[in-house]
Regions:
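NAD(P)-dependent Rossmann-like dehydrogenase/reductase catalytic/cofactor-binding core
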Residues: 24-99
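Anionic-ligand binding region
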Residues: 1-25
Length: 99
């Protein structure tokens, strides 16, 4: 899932004028930095979000767009579907040949 998110972030960077390498590097570094900060501090992701947003700022504008697009709901659904599929494969259903 994270690779898809990094790719989409990089595509967004290219869309607003960055070259592909810069966009990919910035996207990957953003994800890496956030993950490291969460692991090192033990902070809740919501706390990290609050730390990096300011009223009317760029981060909150991007977060609002993600929420409007249903990213939270979509990620939860992806985990649920993957879990269901894993259980199906564990039972050896006839659909496992399509995986």
């Amino acid at each position: 899932y994270v690779a898809l998110m990094i790719e989409a972030l990089a595509d967004g960077g290219v869309k607003v004028g960055l070259d592909r390498l810069t966009a990919m590097t910035l996207a990957a570094q953003t994800v890496l930095g956030s993950a490291k900060l969460l692991i090192e501090t033990g902070a809740h992701p919501g706390q990290l979000k609050d730390m990096v947003t300011s009223p009317g700022g760029t981060a909150i504008a991007g977060i609002a767009a993600l929420e409007e697009g249903g990213v939270r709901r979509t990620l939860i659904s992806a985990v649920e579907r993957a879990t269901l599929r894993s259980r199906e494969l564990g039972r050896g259903t006839k659909d496992d040949k399509k995986a």
